[in-house]
């Protein structure tokens, strides 16, 4: 079925293939990806778009010496197939299986681990400068998408690349989402000339000869250079790169292996930084993904025959958030919403459609988004920044310096807080409590159910301070009655009997309630408290628990260090009272990829583990 792919054993095997064989291999890879990702889920559209690009990179560069870095990394599936992981592909993004991103522990050819965007050029530049300092001669290549190129970090790196003129090859994978491609005969002609090494050599010889002519030589050379640059600026979008000192080659058809290998061969001969602008199509070769690349960007299991996704719950925290923002915006014209290239992921499609003038998608620019919100707040608007937990951490300084110091009323809708599952270490939202609670003037909240999120948003938008509301991926698993009225820093009793209190936040309240029900069947009563405010703590309730000699077990989907439990312990220590406080949460480590249910059990946060912990406390303390 996959004749060429099945017989592919070494990273350099492709160098022995004819052009026709490479084209056949591309077809086999697409078929393999569609078949396998339909079962495991994953990032399909972006990988279908880089098949020929990846084959060309492996054809021209020798990964036993050269270095290849994939920005974000979710488009590295073809790379994984060609570096010995085909037989493990059925475990993609599964617990104990291969990651959906480059991982150094998986392969010596995964030279730098990625997951967040816009990092590849910086990493590649660092590796290139290390190469030069060590006197080595290999190539370093960074592959970055047009979306990731909007990130400030990528632009900072480009500025540095051009200034120092370090030899580096950058592949701009433009899937027509952000950067417009050049069209027209003149553009194609100039590109053909600039790619041809003979043209570059001829141009250098002409310039050298002209400069030797007395009186007019240097002037003529400068005139021709100005004329050439003037023409380029009119027809070639790559002049931005040229102007900052990076040679631009392109645009190139990213699905034409012959053209790709020719331009990459030419780029290898340039001793300065080069950027190759490649045009690709997301979802290439799979009709359903080509028509709807957004749907197939990150997708769960689906029917590969018709592109239909396996049935899932339609109601999620993200959808509830998006719908509520529309409702609130209809009532209050001061409400504005900001997102950083995550409109659909954060559930804001309808808001963007109904209030386009009050919706701001700033691209992959979380730092800018936070301070933009601050500026809006200063002028009396009510900004809401919707962002995944894992990406909010990119704007730490702006949160602290631009928002909290001034105590600006910005609401941060922190989506995907806690375990997100299959994307693994780079995307788990388990650090936000630790850095948000340490910021003066920041209030941190967490709803126990989707309905409670709607009331929390309405309340937060009428406060005069920065507020972060963190909520998980997916929807409710247990029905819980929402709290509708909030008092600053006050928690809620769900159950109020027993000498052990389960103090939980967010989704962990579900786990605590289910654990309490099981314990009650065993004759053990426990209290369940929803810590809807992580900061400030409900010190009144805590003092009462301590006075009643109640053992406190905190449950959070955050790392323990710096989280809810740590915050409670810090407060309890100020009271100089003997009290047992047990913290359940994630250890001081990165959480691997896997289904949330598996990860909760692994870290002792599932219902059964909570029951076991309570039983252990009961046995040791003799409370009952």
Swiss-Prot record:
CDD domains, alphabetized = TPP_DXS (cd02007), TPP_PYR_DXS_TK_like (cd07033)
- GO BP terms, alphabetized: 1-deoxy-D-xylulose 5-phosphate biosynthetic process; isopentenyl diphosphate biosynthetic process, methylerythritol 4-phosphate pathway; terpenoid biosynthetic process; thiamine biosynthetic process
**Which GO molecular function annotations are given, in alphabetical order?**
1-deoxy-D-xylulose-5-phosphate synthase activity; magnesium ion binding; thiamine pyrophosphate binding
Give binding positions for Mg(2+): 146, 175
Q: Where does thiamine diphosphate bind?
A: 74, 115-117, 147-148, 175, 286, 366
| Lineage: superkingdom | Bacteria
Cofactor field? Mg(2+); thiamine diphosphate
SMART domains listed in its UniProt record: Transket_pyr (SM00861)
Cofactor stoichiometry and binding? Binds 1 Mg(2+) ion per subunit. Binds 1 thiamine pyrophosphate per subunit.
Gene Ontology cellular component list: cytosol
Pathway given for this chain reads: Metabolic intermediate biosynthesis; 1-deoxy-D-xylulose 5-phosphate biosynthesis; 1-deoxy-D-xylulose 5-phosphate from D-glyceraldehyde 3-phosphate and pyruvate: step 1/1
Q: Which reaction does it catalyse?
A: D-glyceraldehyde 3-phosphate + pyruvate + H(+) = 1-deoxy-D-xylulose 5-phosphate + CO2
| Coiled-coil ranges (or none) | none
Enzyme Commission designation: 2.2.1.7
Alphabetically ordered keywords of this record: Isoprene biosynthesis, Magnesium, Metal-binding, Thiamine biosynthesis, Thiamine pyrophosphate, Transferase
Its subunit composition reads: Homodimer.
Instruction: Give the family this protein belongs to, as stated in its UniProt record.
Output: Belongs to the transketolase family. DXPS subfamily.
Functional summary from the UniProt entry: Catalyzes the acyloin condensation reaction between C atoms 2 and 3 of pyruvate and glyceraldehyde 3-phosphate to yield 1-deoxy-D-xylulose-5-phosphate (DXP).
Under what name is this protein listed? 1-deoxy-D-xylulose-5-phosphate synthase
């Amino acid at each position: 079925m996959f004749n060429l792919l099945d017989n592919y054993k070494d990273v350099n095997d492709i160098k022995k293939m004819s052009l026709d064989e490479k084209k056949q291999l591309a077809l086999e890879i697409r078929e393999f990806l569609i078949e396998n990702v339909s079962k495991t889920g994953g990032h399909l559209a972006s990988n279908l778009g880089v098949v020929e690009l990846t084959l060309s990179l492996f054809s021209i560069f020798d990964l036993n010496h050269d270095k290849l870095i994939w920005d974000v990394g979710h488009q590295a599936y073809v790379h994984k197939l060609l570096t010995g992981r085909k037989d493990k592909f059925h475990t993609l993004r599964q617990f104990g299986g291969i990651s959906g991103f480059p991982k150094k522990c998986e392969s010596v050819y995964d030279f730098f681990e990625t997951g967040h965007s816009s990092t590849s050029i910086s990493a590649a530049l660092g590796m290139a400068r290390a190469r030069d300092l060590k006197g080595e001669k290999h190539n370093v290549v960074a592959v970055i998408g047009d979306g990731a190129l909007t990130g400030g970090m990528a632009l900072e790196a480009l500025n540095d690349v051009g200034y120092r003129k370090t030899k580096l090859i950058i592949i701009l994978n433009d899937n027509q989402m952000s950067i417009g491609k050049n069209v027209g005969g003149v553009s194609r002609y100039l590109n053909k000339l600039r790619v041809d090494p003979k043209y570059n050599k001829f141009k250098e010889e002409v310039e050298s000869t002209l400069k030797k002519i007395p009186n007019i030589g240097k002037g003529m050379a400068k005139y021709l250079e100005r004329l050439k640059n003037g023409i380029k600026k009119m027809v070639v979008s790559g002049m931005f790169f040229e102007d900052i000192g990076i040679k631009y080659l392109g645009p190139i058809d990213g699905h034409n292996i012959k053209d790709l290998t020719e331009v990459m061969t030419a780029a290898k001969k340039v001793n300065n930084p080069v950027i190759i602008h490649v045009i690709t199509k997301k979802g290439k070769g799979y009709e359903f993904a080509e028509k709807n690349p957004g749907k197939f960007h990150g997708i769960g299991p689906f029917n590969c025959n018709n592109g239909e996704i396996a049935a899932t719950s339609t109601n999620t925290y993200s959808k509830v958030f998006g719908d509520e923002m529309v409702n609130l915006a209809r009532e209050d014209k001061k409400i504005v919403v900001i997102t950083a290239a995550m409109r659909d992921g954060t559930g804001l499609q309808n808001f963007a459609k109904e209030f386009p003038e009050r919706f701001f998608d700033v691209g992959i620019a979380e730092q800018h988004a936070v301070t933009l919100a601050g500026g809006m707040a200063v002028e009396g608007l009510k900004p809401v920044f919707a962002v995944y937990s894992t990406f909010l951490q990119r704007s730490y300084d702006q949160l602290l310096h631009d928002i909290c110091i001034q105590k600006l009323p910005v609401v941060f809708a922190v989506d995907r807080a806690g375990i997100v599952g299959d994307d693994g270490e780079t995307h788990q939202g388990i650090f936000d409590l630790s850095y948000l609670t340490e910021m003066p003037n920041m209030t941190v909240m967490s709803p126990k159910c989707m309905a409670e999120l709607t009331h929390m948003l309405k309340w937060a938008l009428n406060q005069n301070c920065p507020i972060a509301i963190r909520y998980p991926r997916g929807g409710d698993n247990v029905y819980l009655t929402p709290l509708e009225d909030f008092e600053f820093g006050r928690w809620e009793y769900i159950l109020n009997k027993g000498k052990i209190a389960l103090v939980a936040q967010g989704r962990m309240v579900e786990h605590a309630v289910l654990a309490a029900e099981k314990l009650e069947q065993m004759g053990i009563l426990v209290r369940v408290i929803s810590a809807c405010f992580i900061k400030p703590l409900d010190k009144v309730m805590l003092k009462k628990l301590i006075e009643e000699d109640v053992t406190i077990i905190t449950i959070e989907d955050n790392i323990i260090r710096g989280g809810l439990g740590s915050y409670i312990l810090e407060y309890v220590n100020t009271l100089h009272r003997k009290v047992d406080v047990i913290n359940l949460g994630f250890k001081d480590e990165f959480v691997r990829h896997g289904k949330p249910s598996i990860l909760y059990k692994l870290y002792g946060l599932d219902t059964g583990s909570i029951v076991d912990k309570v039983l252990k406390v009961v046995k040791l303390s003799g409370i009952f």
